[in-house]
Amino acid sequence: MRLEGKVALVTGGASGIGESIARLFIEHGAKICIVDVQDELGQQVSQRLGGDPHACYFHCDVTVEDDVRRAVDFTAEKYGTIDIMVNNAGITGDKVIDIRDADFNEFKKVFDINVNGVFLGMKHAARIMIPKMKGSIVSLASVSSVIAGAGPHGYTGAKHAVVGLTKSVAAELGRHGIRVNCVSPYAVPTRLSMPYLPESEMQEDALRGFLTFVRSNANLKGVDLMPNDVAEAVLYLATEESKYVSGLNLVIDGGFSIANHTLQVFE
């Protein structure tokens, strides 16, 4: 029970990686507040995880500061504190790659959720954590935070920004005993990512098609990256096992971002 007695707030916790994080945290003894805009899914996940007093759901649009403030205050009042803040909510945005065709409003929407939402989560978690002189803030970035060409421009720019925010806030909050890190996974099969499979690679079995495409481009063969694997990395950064780790972008990509896939020296 690596999180016995801890309290965590997980944004975007109603589905995908966020749901896996919430489930794993519960398994390790934490109390969880799932924050999302998907009310029905969020309530269902909360109940599947045992409901009150182990898990609860709170409606929150992470782009609205009052929503984030209320979600943080609700969690702290219900459970007495917040030990772990997981900024997981995010979107990929339109599949448009050609910058000449990119919609500026869509670009701003991606930044609003993926960057501003993370900033607000950090800001309001800090309100609770600073007086206690401890806490862990973990945000979800992406392999697109360290390379280009793996996603649309807005998504890539936003995930780079998450890494910058993580380092900047870690530099400030270290004096208060608060650790701030982020996790950058390679392609993971979720409801958010699977529609971005190239049409030429789609199969009748959507999951099989996605995994086939991802495996063909992966550096590390013979293993698939799944939502629970990302949750395990977040768990590590949330626990005392990483007590001296802060400002880290933990890249979980099987070496994809460090390999030059065009030269094929090792073929």
Swiss-Prot record:
Active-site residues, Swiss-Prot/TrEMBL: Y155
Cystine bridges: none
Residues that coordinate or bind NAD(+): 9-33
Keyword Zinc-finger: no
Main EC class the enzyme belongs to: oxidoreductase
InterPro entries, per database record: ABA2-like (IPR045309), NAD(P)-bd_dom_sf (IPR036291), SDR_fam (IPR002347)
Keyword Chloroplast included in the entry's annotation: no
Sequence positions that bind substrate: S142
Record annotation: effect of changing S142A: Strong reduction in oxidoreductase activity toward 8-hydroxy-alpha-humulene and borneol
This protein's GO CC annotations: cytosol
Entry comment describing in which tissues the protein is expressed: Expressed in leaves, stems and rhizomes.
SUPFAM superfamilies cross-referenced by the UniProt entry: NAD(P)-binding Rossmann-fold domains (SSF51735)
EC number: 1.1.1.326
Any one GO molecular function term: zerumbone synthase activity
NCBIfam families registered for this protein in UniProt: PRK07231.1
Family: Belongs to the short-chain dehydrogenases/reductases (SDR) family.
Function description: Catalyzes 8-hydroxy-alpha-humulene into zerumbone in presence of NAD. Also converts borneol to camphor in vitro. Zerumbone is a highly promising multi-anticancer agent.
Protein name: Zerumbone synthase
Gene expressing this chain: ZSD1
